[in-house]
Amino acid sequence: MASGTIRLRTMEGIERPALATVMPRQEGHFVLIDAGANPSAKPEHLVHNAVLGSAYCQHVLGTENPRVGLMTIGTEEGKGNETTNAANDLLKSIPGIINYHGPIEGFQLFENVVDVVVCDGFTGNVILKTAESLFKCLFKDFLGGEIKKNPVRQLGYLFSKGAYDAIRTQLNPERYGGAPLLGIKGNILKAHGLSLIHISEPTRLGMISYA
């Protein structure tokens, strides 16, 4: 990413590019930005992330007037750290540019509260990898292990396999394997693990639209 940023340069007004990844939720999906490009961020960088994420969500994913939320530890005024509190004040001062919902907490991530979640790259990467690990533990280790313990549960699984497979497909991290680097004068898509080998139609369509 560093070499790509140097070669392609950042857009005017953008100091640091950010990784935007699409994640599933109760209804549809949301954009998480930054997902790991910059572990630390200044308040103005979070504002840039909000604008970039909102534009990506609207013009690439087709979400009309996307709601933008700032990840913090509480929705009350002053509940976050110095950076998020300052970023919150800045985001509230630019009405009309983005549809700013306000601060959100971790338990709201996968609810239909906002369409874009803004954070620094350290927080975003922890969220992303925790969600991926939880998917594996839930379906392969926890649920799969419990089903195998009892023949009655195995029979029940056969009747509910359609719903089980649909949820597993929706939550599978490989469906969301490509993360565009936003804020540069060009196209860079970051992928990890086997995500490019198993890249799905939603990700491919996102790549085409972004390009």
Regions found by a protein language model. Name each.
Residues 1, 76-79, 108-111, 125:
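Short, active-site-adjacent cap segments at secondary-structure transitions
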Residues 35-39, 75-77, 189, 193-194:
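Short beta-strand and adjoining strand-loop segment in the mid-core
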Residues 39-106:
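Glycine-rich phosphate/diphosphate-binding loop of Rossmann-like nucleotide-binding domains
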